[in-house]
Design a protein with these regions (language model features):
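Acidic low-complexity segments
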Residues: 88-152
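Ferredoxin-type iron-sulfur electron-transfer modules in oxidoreductases and energy-metabolism complexes
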Residues: 335-349, 359, 363-430
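Short, conserved beta-turn/loop elements at beta-strand boundaries and strand-helix junctions
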Residues: 83-89, 304
Length: 430
């Protein structure tokens, strides 16, 4: 839905999607023949592996790749480890991919993995062992990080992009699980302030949920974590810092519902709710095992990928393209978007025409027209020093309104990545 006011020069006219526009039926994607889990550690640097090819795993059982942070996650299927390999991500990120071949279809819904014995008494260590990388990707390690003490937990029911309805669906249909999840958070985190952020048009009816309720505007990108910090919590995040540096940890509402279901049912939740957007722009909701190849989702919806079609994880403003239909659905994948090759918006190398649309739309008031000039010629440090590159929240609005079709959003992401590389090299030299 688009609305534009002549006077609201710094206000986006893009709105978050309303759940009423989605079909009521939620499609259940079958258990695939193989799943893949991405561990946030480079395969080449992973020594003393605790996992071997051929090892058997059960649903809900923690898979231990290595000791330490990021080295374990619960399996979403019962099966056998088929491969352990390197996986390349965006902007130089390196992962370790563990592929599991599913076995015993009759036990896929019943296996326990050992969590039931701990469900009666929630504690942070057990939650980190079993529920880190569960649906919604609960950032439980953040609560255990003594280097950055947390005093506030924000539960966001705001979508990360337009056209998505995943979190709204959880808010509306998993209310009991969310309430139980808030109770679990209080038990495992201590006496922290817990804030639930919901769309302004959905703020009624949450007075008894056990958290402080705040309403965010339905104008995109009001639900961005940095804007919530500034506009609702009154805690502006300094340039180069994160909400965690300011004592605030963000949970998606699905992550909290996952905690609630886990400690209510005594099993580790394994199904992720996603919004699927097909080539015609039609939206659907589905549940899928974390680790399922996106090809299985496409098959369930009858979508055939042609040469030069685009497959995106996330929404149209900030989503990231994936190059392989076997890429797994991740714990924080809220949407899958398919764009037909004939419908993909084009980008150009035309120069800026100084129309000012990007400056008017920017929610953090960055002089985008000057910033992009430096980014185009690789002047990354200068763009940070002179035009606040690191203050950009990467909402994508500037690229959306650009008359010259300059890929501003991509320039900004690349600029931040290259700047971080330059600083890492300088630090190593020192």
């Amino acid at each position: 839905m688009l609305k534009k006011s002549f006077f609201a020069l710094n206000r986006s006219w893009l709105k978050y999607e309303r759940l009423a526009s989605f079909p009521q039926r939620v499609r259940r994607i079958p258990v695939p023949g193989q799943v893949t889990y991405l561990f946030n550690t480079p395969f080449e640097k992973t020594t003393d592996l605790k996992l071997t090819v051929g090892a058997e795993v059960t649903r809900g059982q923690p898979i231990v790749l290595k000791e330490g942070r990021g080295g374990r996650r619960a399996s979403t299927v019962t099966g056998v480890v088929a491969a352990i390999a390197s996986h390349d991500g965006n902007f130089g990120r390196r992962y370790t991919a563990v592929t599991v071949t599913t076995t015993h279809p009759e036990t896929q819904e019943a296996a326990d993995g050992g969590f039931a014995a701990h469900a009666a008494a929630p504690d942070l260590d057990t939650a980190r062992t079993y529920l880190t990388s569960a649906p919604g990707n609960p950032p439980l390690d953040c609560l255990a990080d003594d280097r950055r003490p947390i005093d506030t937990i924000v539960i966001s029911a705001m979508e990360e992009d337009i056209l998505i309805g995943t979190r709204q669906y959880i808010l509306k249909n998993d209310f009991t699980a969310v309430a139980r999840g808030i109770d679990v958070l209080r038990q495992i985190s201590g006496e922290m302030r817990i804030v639930l952020v919901v769309p302004r048009d959905s703020v009624q009816g949450f007075g008894h949920i056990g958290a402080e309720v705040m309403a965010a505007d339905v104008d995109y990108p009001s639900g961005h974590s940095l804007l919530i910090m500034n506009n609702l919590l009154g805690k502006p995040v300094p340039t180069g810092a994160s909400p965690e540096d300011c004592g605030v940890c963000f949970f998606s509402i699905e992550a909290v519902a996952t905690l609630g279901r886990a400690y209510t049912d005594g099993t580790v939740p394994v199904r992720k709710t996603i919004t699927f957007i097909d080539k015609a722009g039609a939206q659907s909701l589905a549940t899928v095992r974390v680790g399922t190849p996106v090809a299985a989702v496409l098959s369930a919806f009858g979508i055939v990928l042609n040469d030069r079609d685009r497959l995106i994880f996330g929404g149209p403003m900030t989503g990231q393209a994936v190059h392989d239909a076997n890429h797994p659905i991740l714990a924080d994948t809220d949407a899958v978007l398919v764009q037909d090759r004939d419908s993909i918006p084009y980008s150009s190398d035309y120069p800026c025409i100084n129309c000012g649309e990007c400056i008017r739309i920017c929610p953090v008031h960055i002089p985008i027209d000057m910033l992009v000039r430096l980014l185009e010629v690789g002047q990354y440090q200068e763009s940070a020093d002179q035009y606040a590159l690191e203050s950009c929240i990467e909402c994508g609005l500037c690229g959306y309104v650009c008359v010259a079709k300059i890929p501003i959003f991509q320039y900004i992401r690349l600029g931040k990545y290259e700047l971080a590389k330059e600083r890492a090299v300088e630090a190593a030299d020192d």
